[in-house]
């Protein structure tokens, strides 16, 4: 019998509340399938939060007539475009799980500094009201990816120095047009990078544990 929508929501919430194992061999051990399920759920949640925040910022501060031209100018703005990471699902399927985990970790870690300023910028919105927890959510996903890497690491050379730059902090001066455009660009990159990390994790989960949700 198929699970009801309510049961599915409860299961997803329960998985999000599960802690990561602190070390390999910890008892009781969490199955690899659960590690992947947790990581995917956390990445999906962060990606959706980033997308909602981007849209709300856009509606609040960016005139509709300027959005298209600004979005085109943002194409080469993201530092993550300088690393040899897959740009979509098809390319991701050509990479090993270890490579995808390393790229995911790099993307997440590049935002740990900037997002600490997010709550200082956005204070008057239901969406922005959750921004003070984004850092905690990113750290949680970082720990989950590191747990997966401990399980799958094959001893091959690490890729931890590929992304030497991180992103600038968000600008709190919302009366400045330059600051608004900077924040708009940062939110665009944040959304794109979390979409990449989510895609990589879903590709890995689907090819290891074939399931109906693999079509994305």
Curated annotation (Swiss-Prot):
Disulfide bonds: 78-189, 206-214
Gene Ontology, cellular component aspect: extracellular space; nucleus; plasma membrane; secretory granule; trans-Golgi network
Pfam families: Hormone_1
Sites where the protein binds Zn(2+): 45, 198
Superkingdom assignment: Eukaryota
InterPro entries: 4_helix_cytokine-like_core, Somatotropin, Somatotropin/Prolactin, Somatotropin_CS
Subcellular location: Secreted
Role played: Plays an important role in growth control. Its major role in stimulating body growth is to stimulate the liver and other tissues to secrete IGF1. It stimulates both the differentiation and proliferation of myoblasts. It also stimulates amino acid uptake and protein synthesis in muscle and other tissues.
PANTHER family reported for this sequence: SOMATOTROPIN (PTHR11417:SF2), SOMATOTROPIN,PROLACTIN (PTHR11417)
Protein name (Swiss-Prot/TrEMBL): Somatotropin
Name of the gene this protein is made from: GH1
């Amino acid at each position: 019998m198929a699970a009801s929508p309510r049961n599915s929501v409860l299961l997803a919430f329960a998985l999000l509340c599960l802690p990561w194992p602190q070390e390999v061999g910890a008892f009781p051990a969490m199955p690899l399938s659960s590690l992947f399920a947790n990581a995917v759920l956390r990445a999906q949640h962060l990606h959706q939060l980033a997308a909602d925040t981007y849209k709300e910022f856009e509606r609040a501060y960016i005139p509709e007539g300027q959005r298209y031209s600004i979005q085109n100018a943002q194409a080469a703005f993201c530092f993550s475009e300088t690393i040899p990471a897959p740009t979509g699902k098809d390319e991701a399927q050509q990479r090993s799980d270890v490579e995808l985990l390393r790229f995911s970790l790099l993307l997440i870690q590049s935002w740990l500094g900037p997002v600490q300023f997010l709550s200082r910028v956005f204070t008057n919105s239901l969406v922005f009201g959750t921004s003070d927890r984004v850092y905690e959510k990113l750290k949680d996903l970082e720990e989950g990816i590191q747990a997966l890497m401990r399980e799958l690491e094959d001893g091959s050379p690490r890729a931890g120095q590929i992304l030497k730059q991180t992103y600038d902090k968000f600008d709190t001066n919302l009366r400045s047009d330059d600051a608004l455009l900077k924040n708009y660009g940062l939110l665009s990159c944040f959304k794109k990078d979390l979409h990449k990390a989510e895609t990589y994790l879903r590709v890995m989960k689907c090819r290891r544990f074939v399931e109906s949700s693999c079509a994305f």
